[in-house]
Swiss-Prot record:
Pfam families: Prenyltransf (PF01255). This is Isoprenyl transferase. The keyword Coiled coil does not apply. Catalyzes the condensation of isopentenyl diphosphate (IPP) with allylic pyrophosphates generating different type of terpenoids. GO terms for biological process: polyprenol biosynthetic process. SUPFAM superfamilies: Undecaprenyl diphosphate synthase. The keyword Magnesium applies. It comes from Oceanobacillus iheyensis (strain DSM 14371 / CIP 107618 / JCM 11309 / KCTC 3954 / HTE831).
Amino acid sequence: MSIKIPFLSKQVKETELEDWDNIPSHIAIIMDGNGRWAQKRGLPRIAGHREGVSTVNRIVKTAVNANVKVLTLYTFSTENWKRPKSEVDFILKLPKEFLHVYLPGLIENNVRVQTIGDFNAVPKHTQDAIEYAMEKTKDNDGLVLNFALNYGSRYEIIHAVKQIVQKTKASELDVEQLDESYFEKHLFTNGLSDPDLLIRTGGEYRLSNFMLWQLAYTEFWFTEKLWPEFDEDTFHQALMEYQQRKRRYGGI
């Protein structure tokens, strides 16, 4: 049955999903299309990024109401530094703006904020805002809102390998003890389950260096809708299609 959350502007209806017990525990989203959304309207690209913040709030609400356990949002990639500096600076201010406005609602609704990625490379004002939100929500045990910030999967894997090599050189690890479980403990996502469902907006069909290790058995769902257009109904469509799939994990 649906769970009504006070800060939702629109409640999820029971008839919108076939099975409320078969909800993906961990959903990861590649939020693509902000710039194109703005350009289609004759607006600067940053207007699309600002509109995308409203979509984040809307989808967090929907995920809470659907009892999703983890929502990972690809917020800023290690490749995004190649964009114009003015755009990069603007994007990296958005987490602070989002949390300034919406943190009280996240706290009220038991959401816990965390981040993955090379966090130390982002501006201090961004670090401060996220660290404050993490501290304020650390005891919450509802939805984990996980911002992938300055995140790149290849960097993550190399970073893990370097840590393991150092432990091997220091005789802290016998290489024969190395297995998938041990390796995963050195990834940024340590402690999180792998995504059950990946959603990518914007009509592109690629992973863009996102969670390459973790997505091995994840169900993928793509939509032509640009991120600012992504709404509750589209989110529910992704959930309903997920419910129709049979996850075999290499079996029959």
